[in-house]
Amino acid sequence: MDRRLLALAAGMFAVGTDSFVVAGILPQVANSLNVSVSVAGQMVTVYALSYALLSPLIAAFASHWPRKRLLLAGLAVFVAGNVITALAPTMGWVLFSRFIAGLGAAMYSPTATASGAALAPPEKRAQALAVVIAGLSSATALGSPLGSFIGSLGNWRDTLWFVSAVGLVAAVAVHLMLPAIAALPSASLRQRLAPLRDSRVALTLLTTLAAYAGMFSVYTYMGVSFDRATGGRAEVLAGLMLLW
């Protein structure tokens, strides 16, 4: 296995864990900050919107940056956002920090997939992309339950420290293992969005959006939905998330 791809996958694991782990600590966040669960759930909304909306913008406007520099900058912003969340005294600070973390994720993820493809010969690019994306997939299976379990041992802030640590480890791995990767040929935002004019592409993306929106709307509030079954025990919830 190419260690360079594993370094990129580690960063994707951190980004994915941050996307999903809030589901396991949402009731704790709401109780700690004296807000409703629905308000605390905006942590997921702000992170997801920041991540989704800024990704194509950054990919277009930062295309002239060397890839490795952009990867490290993205992980630095991502870690900073999670550290602020871990220290945040109010819900306002939490939401602000989630935006920052989403910005870092938006800087990192598209760059990581493009870099993974650039590191592999043409006949192995699909395999390289699969390795990088596996970091994101494994975050659902392992990162989120583990982060929730860590939160159950202390408080929800420990979970954010865990995510920050994973992001920091990924940054060190990228710094040590990745070679310098030249900036890829630039494409304007209009060029990047041009495929959406094809109704087949647009419909496929809308279907994917609807499916994931429905799935993660349920997943985000899993801690509340299963509160009676888990007896409010976060470690039991972490086990359910692992099974899911």
Q: Which residue ranges define each predicted feature?
A:
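Extracytoplasmic
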Residues: 4-37, 55-58, 218-223
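Residue-level signature of mid-helix packing/kink "hotspots" within the transmembrane helices
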Residues: 20, 48-56, 140-141
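Interfacial helix-cap and linker-helix signal at transmembrane-aqueous boundaries
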Residues: 29-30, 61-62, 146-154, 226-227
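Conserved MFS/SLC helix-loop-helix module at the cytosolic interface between two early adjacent transmembrane helices
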Residues: 53-92
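MFS-fold secondary transporters
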Residues: 81-86, 101, 117, 174
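Cytoplasmic helix-loop-helix junction between adjacent transmembrane helices
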Residues: 91, 97-136
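C-terminal membrane-cytosol helix-exit motif in multi-pass small-molecule transporters
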Residues: 164-184
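Juxtamembrane intracellular "pre-TM" segments in multi-pass secondary transporters
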Residues: 178-207
